[in-house]
Amino acid sequence: MMLDLGEYQEESVNIIAIMGPHGVYHKDEPIKELEAALQRQGFQTIWPQNSADLLQFIEHNPRICGVIFDWDEYSVDLCSDINQLNEYLPLYAFINAHSTMDVSSQDLRMTLWFFEYALGLSEEIATRIGQYTREYLENITPPFTRALFNYVQEGKYTFCTPGHMGGSAYQKSPVGCLFYDFFGGNTLKADVSISVTELGSLLDHTGPHLEAEEYIARTF
């Protein structure tokens, strides 16, 4: 199941860096339209001054989820520099009919997508960027964490732990409301025991628990 972070993407990993402007209408106007479309989908956008500024931002701000740039100006060199910092970060290169596509098989292993400069396609491109962002978050999220996020987002409840009915039991009194507001709804909705079948079994080593164990073994 694809991880859907739509409910809290606005305050999560949702920043798109845009390299530009370029001083020519046929490039700047499509990117301006795309920026507006991305913002309507809940993304924040920033405009780094240059490639060095961009790399500093990526290194120190993990909430960035993609980079839009002009292929003719930055080419694969910028991609390689970004890849050294975050090999999973989606990169969106914009080209025109005269762009030179000098890309090796090694470069194609990057999370790199190409779009053509064109007016009137901003909504479609923004939708695709949204999908690539969800794939990015899916790839960087550990198996059990991903399963727990999905469990909470599906609105499921369990009576086996203090998060009774997603924490609604705490909202029966003033102090309970203060407690709920302090920790937040997701904390209480995710407060589950090892008996939740959707999350697998910690005792039998099945499902997301097993996937998490295998992930940890590969990582460490």
Over which residues does each language-model region extend?
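Residues that mark the start of a beta-strand
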Residues: S12-I16, Q44, E87
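Conserved acidic segment of CheY-like receiver
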Residues: S12-D28, L34-L38
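A short, well-structured beta->alpha microelement
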Residues: M2-L3, E35-H60, V76
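Alpha-helix termination/capping residues and helix-transition junctions
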Residues: E10, H60-N61
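Non-catalytic signal-transmission and effector/linker regions of two-component phosphorelay proteins
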Residues: M1-N14
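N-terminal cationic-hydrophobic initiation segments that often serve targeting/anchoring roles
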Residues: Q39, I58, I82-N86, A217
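Conserved N-terminal alpha-helix of the aminotransferase class I/II PLP-enzyme fold
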Residues: D181-F220
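N-terminal glycine-rich, Lys/His-bearing helix-loop that initiates the first secondary-structure elements
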Residues: I31, N50, L54, P62-V192
